[in-house]
């Protein structure tokens, strides 16, 4: 015991792992406590695993146990829309139990492990970024960055990361992508993007984030002509010339969409349509709007259901956060967040709240607003005021998460 205490005091990585585990367990205990609260209010007697796994979770449960729907099956909502990475990992974990464990519990275990890993490396990314920008390490004894873990475990809509949904795994691969990109380990970053693209289609768009990271790295090494002395196009041209001479960087970029390409190849032989994951989407979304602009106009002006009006304005808020992140020089993250949101907005605003949370970068924007960026804007220097404001924001976030969790347990359509 004394050895562990000593290790906790001296080893910052071990201390971070323990702190995050405590926060994760605490957040999940709250979810457990909400089960009898929900059952008492609604007069039901449902289990935790039942309440935590709505809608798509049931499809993932079916896929883990039975695989993809065969082309001759009559289900109009064929599960080809769901990418395979999460299912494969859940199947492997269930195999370790000799197929005895309940699939929902297997999926929740995988999701919680993934979001825990994501939070750990997300904070490591923050601390490395601080050191790069300031030339000195942050005060880790003051738990620098731990707020990010609190947001990822307890912020509104974070319950998706505890259920049998792909959000936690997708976030993990995104975090690892940015973590290794910051360390200039481009091949590993490309591999993480490949895994992300095998988890959700928008994982492919990490290729743009990688190109931005490569460009910024090249520019920071002073190998690109100063943009004040030369136009932006000359800078880009010089970067492209450099890029095509670097096979390692080219391979890293080519790896990014590999997961999606492998899945498309599988679909070609399985059902004869490489775009089946896209074509089957019509079973969920019958409405037809002009991409992005038409979708947002219809939603934000209340021309469709009230829940979609809410989601439309939620998207507006997300775009505002991404714009702020560009101002704060989180370039690759901000552009990834924008592109990842534009993809679903080509058809509808349905589920965009989940997609925004599931792209991870919104957590970084919120974290920056609650720490350095927000303090700079509000010109806050009094530590007590800072702590008070952050505490109020966290309490509001936690209250919203409890409210949304109750709606989730109740299968409320506002979360679809």
Task: Show the residue positions of the predicted features.
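Start-transfer (signal-anchor) and selected internal transmembrane alpha helices
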Residues: 1-42, 244-255, 385-394
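Membrane-lumen/periplasm interface segments of specific transmembrane helices
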Residues: 27-39, 43, 52, 195-196, ...
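Multi-pass, polyprenyl lipid-linked donor-dependent membrane glycosyltransferases
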Residues: 114, 146-181, 188, 195-208, ...
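Signature aromatic-anchored transmembrane alpha helix within multi-pass, membrane-resident enzymes
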Residues: 253-257, 373-415
């Amino acid at each position: 015991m004394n050895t562990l205490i000593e290790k906790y005091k001296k080893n910052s990585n071990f201390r971070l792992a323990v702190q995050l585990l405590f926060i994760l367990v605490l957040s999940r205990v709250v979810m457990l406590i909400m089960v009898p609260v929900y059952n008492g209010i609604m007069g039901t007697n449902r289990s935790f695993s039942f309440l935590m796994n709505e809608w798509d979770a049931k499809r993932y449960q079916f896929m883990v146990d039975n695989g993809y729907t065969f082309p001759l099956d009559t289900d109009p909502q064929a599960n080809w829309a769901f990418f395979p990475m999460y299912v494969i990992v859940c199947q492997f974990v269930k195999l370790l139990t000799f197929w005895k464990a309940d699939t929902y519990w297997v999926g929740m275990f995988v999701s919680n492990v993934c979001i825990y890993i994501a939070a750990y490396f997300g904070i490591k990314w923050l601390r490395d970024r601080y050191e790069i920008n300031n030339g000195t390490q942050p005060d880790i004894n003051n738990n620098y960055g731990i707020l990010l873990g609190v947001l990822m475990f307890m912020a509104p809509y974070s319950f998706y990361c505890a259920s049998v949904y792909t959000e936690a795994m997708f976030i993990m691969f995104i975090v690892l992508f940015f973590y290794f990109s910051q360390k200039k380990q481009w091949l590993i970053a490309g591999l993480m993007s490949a895994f992300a693209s095998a988890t959700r289609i928008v994982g492919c768009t990490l290729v743009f984030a990688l190109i931005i990271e490569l460009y910024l790295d090249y520019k920071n090494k002073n190998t690109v002509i100063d943009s004040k002395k030369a136009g932006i196009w000359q800078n880009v041209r010089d970067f492209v010339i450099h890029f095509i001479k670097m096979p390692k960087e080219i391979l890293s970029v080519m790896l990014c969409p590999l997961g999606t390409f492998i899945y498309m190849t599988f679909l070609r032989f399985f059902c004869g349509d490489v775009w089946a994951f896209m074509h089957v989407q019509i079973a969920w979304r019958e409405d037809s709007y002009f991409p992005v602009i038409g979708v947002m106009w219809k939603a934000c002006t209340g021309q469709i259901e009230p829940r979609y009006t809410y989601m439309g304005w939620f998207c507006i808020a997300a775009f505002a956060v991404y714009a702020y992140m560009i101002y704060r020089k989180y370039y690759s993250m901000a552009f990834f967040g924008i592109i990842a949101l534009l993809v679903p907005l080509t058809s509808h605003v349905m589920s965009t709240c989940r997609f925004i949370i599931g792209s991870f970068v919104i957590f970084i924007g919120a974290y920056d607003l609650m720490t350095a960026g927000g303090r700079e804007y509000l010109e806050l220097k009094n530590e007590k005021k800072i702590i008070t404001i952050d505490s109020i924001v966290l309490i509001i976030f936690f209250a919203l998460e409890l409210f949304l969790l109750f709606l989730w347990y109740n299968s409320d359509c506002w979360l679809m």
